[in-house]
Amino acid sequence: MNIPLPRRSEAVRTAGAALVAVALAASTAPAASAANTPRDTSRQVQYVDCGTASGKENGSRSRPWRTLDQVNRLELKTGSSILLKRGSRCTGTLAPDGSGREGKPMVIGAYGQGAKPVIDGAGNAETLLLKNTQWVEASNLEITNSGNPGRNKRGVRVQLQDFGTGTHYRLTGLDVHDILGDDTKGTEGSAGILFSVTGSTVPTRFDDVVVSGNTVRTVDREGIYFASTWNNRPVHGDFDPNGPAYVPSTRIVVRGNTLADLGGDGIVITATDGTLVEHNRLDGFQRRSAGYNAGMWPWNADNTVFQYNEVSGGETTRDGMAYDVDEGTFGTVFQYNVSHDNAGGFFLVCTATGKLGNAVIRYNISRNDHFRGIETCRGSFDDVRFHNNTIYAGEGVSQTVVNENTTEKHEIAFDNNIVVKEGSGTASFNLKSGGVTLSHNNLVNTVGTPANPGGTTADPLLSDPTGAVPLGLRLRSGSPALRSGTPVPGSPDRDLYGNPVGNPPNMGAYQGPGTV
């Protein structure tokens, strides 16, 4: 994924210029009227029922607000709750003016019985917009925006603009669907859920974010995306020495989300440090975008861990693979993930015109991924370890197990892996740089196989390779891969299945004893 994020072309503004801009904005702002005067905000809980008849609304449960605009005009008390009635449908943009504090977050959720309340963006650019706020939690809402298809738009946008550090964000139990946006990405791109840092005058970042238990389906372009204008450092090709500095967001967790039918990428992490992406399910991506998109990947981010995710249904070979270690990333770990039935393959490792390093891809499963196992792109890199993975290519599947596009040096240590090709089609290696080394791999029916000291070409006796994933990719008793690997420094103590890793380890992702 070397599509650049939006580049900042302006230098940091001076304080004087900022004051001029504020004065100009004030001089051009419309005069207040009775229609947009903030309402009484003495109550802590604001109730909303867009299906109720008009009357003397005051935000109480008996006289709830009936439009989102009424809520947007409120100056909310710190730690207020905005509760939408279950079974109701509100049209427009919800953009509350409020925030929470430690121990008293602002809550946006539902009340009553029945289906989740619906916010329909009706073709607006934003559906739920949380801007320059913190200590906020949103849950149990249905969010859709199919109007004006092809327009730039988002389902949920959490935005910090020249804010500093914003703390504590929780998005849980949201059903985001039919966000029919355009084909853009980045800080102003179209997405189901977008965390967006913008501006160039105040160093700004997110801290303590959890995005969990949401569904994101039928969205153009991005599923869940983190982007920032504060992303400048000389490790990616879009570095602007006059732009905002590098200010990574921290303590980000993306967990247990279900994504499907995405025009472009699934989950993309940029300008963060220490993000955890786990237990997410993605089925169907790169379906409508003209760009290059993959399932889950980091860009210009450090120490990102992707684990226990499952990705399938990637379309096209632009990029169309499940996972990607992209440029400007260091300390990336992909472990305990499953990939299957992706047209573009299993993995991309791509530095383009930037740098990457210290990446580990281990204890993952790939079944019937087409086109390539590992793909590299232009640009060189070092210190990438691909070990203890199991790749199975069945009937009708052809794959280049490692495909180097150029002769630029790509240092990949390919150790303790199992690669099995069965049925029609081929599995081959296309090595050009001299940087890929193999050791202790179990390679069956591969073509153009390089030297593989300590390895074997015997049948690894996979338990049921066409059955359930990942259970079918275990090893049967008598497998030549059992305890035939070589120890890898820094390995975890358990495998994808929860088995302890022995010494020596098995080849492949499964580290338990032979199954019957």
Regions found by a protein language model. Name each.
Residues 141, 174, 209, 214, ...:
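Consensus "Asn ladder" position of solenoid repeat domains
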Residues 104, 109, 127-179, 207-218, ...:
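Parallel beta-helix/beta-solenoid
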Residues 92-97, 333-339, 351-472:
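Predominantly extracellular beta-rich ligand-binding scaffolds that present long acidic/polar faces
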Residues 1-35:
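Secretory targeting and sorting signals
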Residues 54, 65, 83-86, 92, ...:
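Right-handed parallel beta-helix/beta-spiral solenoid domain characteristic of secreted/periplasmic
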Residues 50-85, 89, 127, 497, ...:
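Acidic Gly/Asp/Thr-rich repetitive segments characteristic of extracellular carbohydrate-active
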Residues 470-472, 479-516:
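Surface beta-loop-beta hairpin patches that serve as ligand-binding interfaces in beta-rich domains
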Residues 121-129, 149-162, 184-202, 206, ...:
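Extracellular beta-strand/beta-solenoid scaffold signature
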